[in-house]
């Protein structure tokens, strides 16, 4: 953090340094400061897709999914943005949180067209399909998600819910065992605790 602050003393308008400061602030739990830094970076670089995507992701994670969608749209308008799959995946997951399943499906499918192994997009598609009770489709997405990146407690809980929806007690039990082994603290919570 000291190096970032030193860089900002040299150039108070350094978007990259401000973005890094936002990451540091968020990691240490200073949510308000992180949000202010992300917003400052976005205002200083209104055409940079990476910066706009980061601010949108922060907004979505902090309870403003509808507002976040406008920032993802702005990020995607940057034709030089090197990671549109990231912004599309974030937009899709955020649209799901905002209660816009049709937009979510469209953005997530576009993200997966660009990056078929995007873990967040795969998890969000599994969540979307499970919410629609399309459990076979949800299973396919959760299996791809588990192959693409290490499991998290929420992913394993979602896998349990999907297998329960399919009536496959054996597969649900396997995921439950993994949850207990890999995330003992999360395993004590109700497996259905994470909303679809």
Task: Give names to the regions the model predicted.
Residues 14, 48, 82-84, 118, ...:
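Residue-level recognition of tetratricopeptide repeat
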Residues 17, 51, 85-87, 121, ...:
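TPR alpha-solenoid repeat register
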């Amino acid at each position: 953090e000291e190096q970032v602050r030193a860089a900002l003393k040299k150039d108070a308008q350094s978007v990259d340094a401000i973005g890094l400061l936002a990451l540091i602030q968020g990691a240490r739990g200073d949510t308000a400061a992180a949000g202010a830094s992300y917003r400052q970076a976005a205002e200083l670089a209104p055409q940079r897709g990476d910066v706009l995507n980061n601010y949108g992701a922060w907004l979505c994670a902090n309870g403003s999914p509808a507002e976040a969608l406008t920032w993802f749209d702005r990020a995607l308008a940057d034709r030089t943005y090197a990671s549109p799959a990231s912004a599309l995946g974030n937009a899709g997951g955020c649209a799901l949180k905002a209660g816009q399943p049709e937009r979510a499906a469209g953005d997530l499918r576009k993200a997966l067209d660009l990056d078929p192994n995007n873990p967040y997009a795969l998890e969000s598609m599994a969540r979307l399909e499970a919410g629609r009770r399309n459990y076979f489709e949800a299973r396919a997405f959760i299996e791809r998600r588990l192959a693409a990146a290490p499991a998290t407690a929420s992913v394993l809980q979602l896998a349990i819910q999907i297998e329960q929806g399919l009536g496959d007690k054996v597969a649900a039990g396997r995921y439950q065992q993994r949850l207990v082994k890999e995330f003992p603290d999360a395993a004590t919570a109700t497996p259905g605790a994470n909303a679809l």
